[in-house]
Every structure is written in C-alpha cells, then in structure tokens.
Amino acid sequence: MIKLVLIRHGQSLWNLENRFTGWTDVDLSENGLSEAREAGAILKKNGYTFDMAYTSVLKRAIRTLWIVLHEMDLTWVPIHKSWKLNERHYGALQGLNKDETAQKYGEEQVHIWRRSVDVRPPALTEDDPRYEATDPRYKTLKKGEFPLTECLEDTEKRVLAYWHSEIAPTLKSGNKVIISSHGNTIRSLVKYLDNLSSDGVVSLNIPTSIPLVYELDENLRPIRHYYLSMDGEVPEGEIPKHISF
C-alpha cells in the first residue's frame, strides 16, 4: 500500500483579508504559521515520514512545507518546486476583496467564477502590474504558457501533467511523498484520484493545513482517504478543528 499526504498551506495574509490570491505571492499569517506547526506535529505524532516533498513556487505553500518538515525533524527531505502546483490563477480578480467583488458583480456571478469547473474569471492584460511573466521563477515557461486567468479545468490540466510526469513515478518507486500546495490545486488532484464529476467537485472544500492522507494501491488507485488529527484518523465526513500551537 502506498500513502500520499496532501496539505493545503496554512492561512495566508490574503485569506485573512478575504481577498482573491491566485498567483500573488503572499505569505502566511501568524495563524497560518501556527497551523503549519500543528500539521507537522500531527504527522510526527502519527508516525509519518517522507522521502520526497513537492510544492509550488509560492511562498505560502513553500513555508508551510518547511515548517511541517522542521516539526518532523525531516529538513533533509528533498523538495521539488513547480509552477504547475501553483494555485489557480484568478486573473483580474487577484487582490480584490471577495465581499466587495460580490457587491459589484453579484453573488451568483462570483460564485460561478469561484466554484464552477469551466468558467474563467476576467483575464489580466499583459500591461497589468499583476502580470508577472517576467518573474525569474517563471523563466522556464514558454511564450503563451503564463496564464492571464484560469478555470479549474485549466488548473487541473497542468497539475495532472506534473502528477503523471513527476509525482506518480516517485510514488510507484516506493517513496513516501507529501505535497504542500493550494486549495484548487488539491481539489484538482482529489477530483482526479476520486474520479469526481464536475458537479461533485463544486462543493469540495479543502481546509488549511490539515493533513489529508490517501492510501493507494500499486496502480495509484485510491483505497481510502482521511484527515489526520492529534488523535489519529478522523471519521469520514469530519474535518478536525485547529488547536492553538
């Protein structure tokens, strides 16, 4: 049996301010730092260890992973970073307050942008200061690869390309893997692993910094999955609450 651990980054500063974040590189809040420490302690107490770690090129996910591995005394574990594990790109919504955006465009429209699978938010323009294609972390992207906006299907396409080329072979080689990433990135992976329909993924929420464990067979088909707490596996359908850490 193969075990895979997925973890969404701890609360970010823009999560706290209720803003659309996407590819904007904001850091963790104080609460997010605490959540990451708690996640590391949970994994350590439950006897987990890792051979390889994957994350995005955004600091909120990277820092969460650093803290988790530090709490587990596993700072030696190799970390692979890829833009393909970035959060969904929210286009021209990035930086905007979600409540204010709902007042401007209507709650129904914002809900469609946020939760639908195939509808993209308004796109950035290439002269927008939020367009960061020249950032050194994206120097390997070919012309036209840097997104101006994304729907969940777009996110899923790049995430699964990286899954099949990099992560799946690592798991099949017998390595214990943790992925520290973002809400929509993990939703994309869960949709694929659990073979969820487009309707099924609409209501799927991934909590910040709670370890989600997938037990997989030799072909990486899910046997079962569950969240972890200090007391071990959490009953199906329940999500543990954070404690002060």
Curated annotation (Swiss-Prot):
Signal peptide coordinates: none
Catalytic activity: (2R)-2-phosphoglycerate = (2R)-3-phosphoglycerate
GO BP term, pick one: glycolytic process
Residue numbers annotated as active site: 9 (tele-phosphohistidine intermediate), 87 (proton donor/acceptor)
Pathway(s) this gene product operates in, as recorded in its UniProt entry: Carbohydrate degradation; glycolysis; pyruvate from D-glyceraldehyde 3-phosphate: step 3/5
Enzyme class, spelled out: isomerase
Annotated site, Transition state stabilizer, chain positions: 182
Single GO molecular function: phosphoglycerate mutase activity
Annotated SMART domains: PGAM
Assigned keywords, A-Z: Gluconeogenesis, Glycolysis, Isomerase
Domain of life: Bacteria
Alphabetical list of Pfam families matching this protein: His_Phos_1
Listed EC numbers: 5.4.2.11
Binding site for substrate: 8-15, 21-22, 60, 87-90, 98, 114-115, 183-184
Function: Catalyzes the interconversion of 2-phosphoglycerate and 3-phosphoglycerate.
Recorded family membership: Belongs to the phosphoglycerate mutase family. BPG-dependent PGAM subfamily.
Name by which UniProt lists this protein: 2,3-bisphosphoglycerate-dependent phosphoglycerate mutase
Species annotation: Bacillus cereus (strain B4264)
